UniProtKB/Swiss-Prot annotation:
InterPro entries: Homeodomain-like_sf, Myb_dom, Myb_TF_plants, SANT/Myb. The gene is MYB41. Transmembrane segments: none annotated. This is Transcription factor MYB41. Keywords: DNA-binding, Nucleus, Phosphoprotein, Repeat, Stress response, Transcription, Transcription regulation. CDD domains: SANT (cd00167).
Length: 282
């Protein structure tokens, strides 16, 4: 069996450290060095376990601890070391002077991991992944670039058109007012226009113009043979223009009077004198 943890011993204090305990630990390590962490609490006059003293010194009391934000070079080093070592924060902190393992772990979970996810990289395997929401954010950043027109021209040949089309549909949901060239949808179409253009188009049948003229020629010939005298009846020799002008034209008013007169005489009938009405009475 292994050794029992030092924290399980009776009389060991737990909980937050006080300023007096911090000063005792700093003074002892400054004069004697850390030495053996299991015997340090007793020698320093602390009612703490060795592990608690080590973590307190390593993460908070060391004079060479670097405070503040992580630089870009430090983040890139953490990403490279994490791709090889995984979640071994103590080993990663040993290669970053001034940074503690606890601080590196917190910065990884709160900043670096989210940045990798937004960039389309799996934070566990460090391999690219095609997550739809992450891909739409990538395309959103790509649309804002000034040289996007040249990239969009060759987008269909570089990436899968189906994925790009789906991402272009998801982009307006995330950004209500997207700014990107209008010819993006044309560039993201599947390359099937060449096959469609290669299909022969149906030729529309047109009637030749000489057919119409040839069909009208016999009719024109027949009209030429028929004279005006054959169509109009001959005028009488006594016909004179003066007689035509002297004949009064019937007005619509006269025509209506004549129609009323004819209708009144149409219903006139006479009763014979020898008609006896009693013969028809019952």
């Amino acid at each position: 069996m292994g050794r029992s943890p030092c924290c399980d011993k009776n009389g060991v204090k737990k909980g937050p450290w006080t300023a007096e305990e911090d000063q005792k630990l700093i003074d002892y390590i400054r004069f004697h060095g850390p030495g053996n962490w299991r015997t340090l609490p007793k020698n320093a006059g602390l009612h703490r376990c060795g592990k608690s003293c080590r973590l307190r010194w390593t993460n908070y009391l060391r004079p060479d601890i670097k405070r503040g934000r992580f630089s870009f070079e430090e983040e890139e080093t953490i990403i490279q070391l994490h791709s090889v070592m995984g979640n071994k924060w103590s080993a990663i902190a040993a290669r970053l002077p001034g940074r503690t393992d606890n601080e590196i772990k917190n910065h990884w979970n709160t900043h670096i991991r989210k940045r990798l996810v937004r960039s389309g990289i799996d934070p566990v395997t460090h391999s690219p992944r095609l997550d739809l929401l992450d891909l739409s954010s990538l395309l959103s950043a790509l649309f804002n670039q000034p040289n996007f027109s040249a990239v969009a021209t060759h987008a269909s040949s570089l990436l899968n058109p189906d994925v790009l089309r789906l991402a272009s549909l998801l982009l307006p949901l995330q950004n209500p007012n997207p700014v990107y060239p209008s010819n993006l949808d044309q560039n993201l179409q599947t390359p099937n226009t060449s096959s469609e253009s290669s299909q022969p188009q149906a030729e529309t049948s047109t009637v030749p113009t000489n057919y119409e003229t040839s069909s009208l020629e016999p009719m024109n010939a027949r009209l030429d043979d028929v004279g005006l005298a054959d169509v109009l009846p001959p005028l009488s020799e006594s016909f004179d223009l003066d007689s035509l002008m002297s004949t009064p034209m019937s007005s619509p008013r006269q025509n209506s009077i004549e129609a009323e007169t004819n209708s009144s005489t149409f219903f006139d009938f006479g009763i014979p004198e020898d008609f006896i009405l009693d013969d028809f009475m019952f």
